[in-house]
A protein has these predicted regions:
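Conserved tyrosine-mediated DNA breakage-rejoining catalytic core shared by Y-recombinases
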Residues: 153-194
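Short, basic interhelical loop/turn and adjoining N-cap
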Residues: 159-162, 274-282
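Basic, Lys/Arg- and aromatic-enriched nucleic-acid-binding interface segment
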Residues: 117-148
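DNA breakage-rejoining catalytic core of tyrosine-based enzymes
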Residues: 104-122, 180-192
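N-terminal core-binding DNA-recognition domain of tyrosine recombinases/integrases
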Residues: 9-108
């Protein structure tokens, strides 16, 4: 790994965020460093980067057919790394704005779909034959709207959820694996389904020393989650995240049945998902 890649990777990690955010940022940093190396540009640290280096990388990615949304995300990563390195002026420069780079204006409409119940049960059955603990995590992701990392780390919260449900709680606390490490509360939209999923997971974890996915670290557990779910059929428009899309639709219906307007239901669901109440329009577009 080049000195620039090492420097950018260190800054990418230091900038914080979820496991996936940091991982994606580190991968982008290595691609960027390889691009400069291939162009024989002698830059060894982030402090030496110039706007033309960044523009050249984005233009090459455009020529490769990479989507505008992906490149917008990559530029957000570049800016966070620059800011972490103290290069705030460059990170906010008009020279590397999305518009200047020709990557503005992409639609935020979702490219994935909510998983249909029939497909979900097929996948759940396949996964159960492979690993009951993985199936339990998958089931909790569907009935609670958990992100992948939240589902993988949920074994640490099973007893808490069981106690909260026993006390009649309408909302459950999601603490581990959340994006940016920000705890959130999620609405119980189907009490019996959630109660049953938590009980099943507790029984399995009780036989596995408290674990659902028995891997030595988070990275290998996440790889196990993604690889086996892909093999079981969660791929393309029905990615593992389609479980969360399906839960979001359930939540919107639940809130509307409670008397909330559509706009209020979107805002409440956005909060449950960990996006905040100001992103109702985003939820409607993406979910």
């Amino acid at each position: 790994m080049s000195r620039l890649a090492q420097d950018m990777k260190k800054l990418a990690h230091r900038a914080g965020g979820s496991h996936k955010t940091v991982h994606d940022r580190e991968q982008m940093a290595q691609r960027f460093a390889r691009h400069l190396l291939a162009q024989n540009i002698q830059v060894t640290s982030t402090s030496q980067l110039k706007a033309r280096h960044i523009a050249g990388y984005i233009h090459e990615r455009l020529a490769q057919g990479i989507s505008l949304r992906t490149l917008q995300n990559e530029m957000a990563m570049v800016r966070s790394i620059l800011a972490e390195a103290g290069r705030t002026h460059l990170s906010q420069s008009e020279l590397i704005s999305n518009q200047s780079l020709g990557i503005s204006g992409a639609s935020r409409d979702g490219t994935h779909r909510a998983i249909p119940d029939a497909l979900y049960h097929q996948v759940l059955d396949r996964v159960h034959h492979i690993d009951a603990g993985l199936a339990a995590s998958l089931q909790l992701a569907r009935v609670m709207g958990l992100r992948g990392q939240e589902a993988v780390q949920c074994c640490q919260s099973l007893k808490t959820w069981d106690k909260q449900l026993a006390k009649g709680a309408e909302r459950l606390s999601v603490i581990f694996g959340t994006k940016g490490g920000r705890p959130r509360m999620t609405q119980v939209t189907d009490r019996e389904a959630v109660r049953q999923a938590v009980k099943e997971a507790l029984n399995i974890a009780g036989e596995r020393d408290g674990h659902l996915i028995d891997k030595p670290d988070l990275k290998s557990a996440m790889d196990y989650w993604h690889n086996h779910l892909r093999d079981a059929g969660l791929t393309g428009e029905y990615s593992p995240h389609s479980l969360r899309y399906a839960w979001a639709q359930d939540a919107i219906r639940y809130y509307e049945e409670q008397g909330l307007s559509h706009k209020e239901a979107l805002a409440a669901t956005s909060t449950d998902l960990g996006h905040g109440d100001g992103r109702g329009r985003y939820i409607e577009q993406v979910y």
